């Protein structure tokens, strides 16, 4: 039983441990758990729906704009705690709990691995699907083509999508443009089917902010470094 209520929504995949009437938060510790990664890989296999026309649009990706956005916020929270209290502090106060220095450092590391893995997955998929002969052609292939993807994302009963796409659909329902259940289901299916194009648009902007350079201007060395970071993250999370 926890002696105080902790809101760890800005520190996703965390453990909460009680020691001597104090709640200790271990940010991102669940990302390093083998069970978390393995369970995520098993989710699609556990889907027993036999009908090819599945009414529920479920996205099984553990790492998505929805979860990575939370991790990026978690990185900001942890770095701000370091800045305010100093990197040499033994413990950091967060809400009504405590974060040990070692847990904070590990949290930054685990979030970093997951963020690199997600961005690397998106980038490598793009590289594999790009029929390009020059760096300039590759940069052009990186330009997002989808209308949606920017901003916040939402999880709607298992469907992960840009909030704007869902809001626009709700507006269409209110206007009467979408007036029956079948049409509504088709709209949800359309949004679900465009997930990876929406994801890429979000990832491009997020990568620019996180790594400090634009893919539209990326050098071969920049891309090589991102692939290396991805490889390191995959190995580190699977240890």
Region spans (language model):
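Acidic, low-complexity intrinsically disordered regions
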Residues: 20, 39, 149, 196-198, ...
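C-terminal amphipathic alpha-helical interaction region
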Residues: 155-239
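Glycine-rich hexapeptide-repeat left-handed beta-helix
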Residues: 1-77
């Amino acid at each position: 039983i926890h002696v105080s209520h902790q809101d760890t929504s800005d520190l996703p995949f965390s453990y909460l441990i009680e020691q001597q009437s104090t709640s200790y938060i271990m940010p991102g510790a669940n990302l390093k758990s083998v069970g978390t990664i393995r369970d995520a890989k098993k989710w699609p296999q556990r889907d027993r729906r036999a009908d090819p026309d599945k009414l529920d649009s479920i996205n099984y990706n553990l790492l998505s704009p929805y979860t990575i956005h939370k991790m990026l916020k978690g990185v900001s929270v942890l770095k701000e705690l370091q800045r305010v209290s100093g990197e040499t502090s033994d413990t950091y106060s967060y809400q009504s709990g405590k974060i040990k220095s070692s847990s904070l450092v590990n949290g930054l590391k685990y979030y970093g691995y997951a963020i690199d893995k997600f961005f690397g997955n998106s980038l490598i998929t793009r590289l594999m699907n790009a029929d390009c002969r020059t760096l300039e052609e590759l940069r052009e292939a990186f330009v997002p083509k989808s209308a949606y993807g920017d901003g916040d994302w939402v999880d709607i009963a298992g469907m992960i999508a840009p909030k704007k796409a869902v809001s626009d659909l709700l507006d269409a329902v209110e206007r009467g443009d979408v007036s029956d259940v079948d049409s509504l289901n088709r709209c949800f299916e359309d949004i679900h089917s465009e997930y990876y194009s929406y994801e890429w648009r979000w990832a491009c902007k997020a990568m620019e902010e996180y790594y400090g350079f634009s893919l539209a201007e990326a050098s071969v060395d920049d891309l090589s470094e991102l692939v290396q970071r991805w490889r390191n993250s995959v190995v580190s999370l699977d240890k």
